[in-house]
């Protein structure tokens, strides 16, 4: 087993004293960090439609806004407060201001900021940019993510350190990189397009031929997108040179075939797919021999199925990175994750799945059986994409066959069914 990442567990008691400068009745304990204590001070302010824009979009402001519909009598209130207040305790020292918006009361503001009804969302507003946090509600993960927020929407590659940063993200996130003349209008358009994707897609640029060659760009104005686990880049059309055109191109191609579930992207990935998408979960422990063989096979599957991007979504999950969730997932889908790799077509909200028979592939000698393993798994993928394998079949099997209602007796009025 790999060294498990320390997880902060938040325990809470008592109730919140609203409007107090110090929340004396809010007790938070963080296991794993004995010296870490919440000092009891309320560092959050309430925002409304009247003061929102002038507050979060003011010059040089760094605002963290918690959009929520948690009510005073909600049992989750104290847990939510502990997460929010400890994060504020740490990050206010670094220039951030923390706010809350009650989405039940501020409906117009909720819609303005693109927050769905009943959804708890966290937005960071920094230097005029809005960045949405999609990670788990854990102070350690959230604070770490905030500290890594870049100062600029585009990283200019000027040295080996920048190049290493670009290369290290290979299988972690979607990357976009372009070659521009320094200070050009085209670079400005590219930077403005990148603003709308901060926190979701990493944008890079090169402004010299030396670094352009190192990242595989040949001509000024060339833009590439590199998606996780796919070898070949996607090229933007040469006509895409304005902010709007670049945004449209990125939006069209941004969905990778396979992406890894992490603490930072959890709620952006662990959600029901769109109606025309198929979601496949792949539980793979990369510390085991079978897990490494399965991961290598899935890498090839993702690369060979790039034409299905946007309609096929493979979510790669390393159980070692989510030890507290293994039992939950096993019970949810009726599988044994610790037994070995598991891969299945799933419906998250319905908590059901159709699971591939792993015995059909040979993971003990993957080199010898590389071609046959790929063929078998690809055939299964093809059946899913063609509709031969579908979760809807299971739903249909459970439904009783419709019966023909009896013909009403002539001369009598049938009763209306309510």
Which role does the model predict for each range below?
Residues 30, 38, 189, 300, ...:
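Residue-level detector of functional hotspots within protein domains
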Residues 71-93, 99, 105-106, 183-199, ...:
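Typically the conserved alpha-helix immediately C-terminal to a functionally engaged Cys/Sec
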Residues 60, 68-73, 284-287:
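Short pre-active-site segment immediately N-terminal to redox-active cysteine/selenocysteine motifs
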Residues 272-327, 333-339, 344, 350:
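Eukaryotic modular interaction domains in large regulatory/scaffold proteins
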Residues 2-69, 86-174, 180-183, 197-209, ...:
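N-terminal leader/targeting and pre-domain segments
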Residues 109-112, 189-193, 214, 297, ...:
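A short acidic, amphipathic alpha-helical/loop segment
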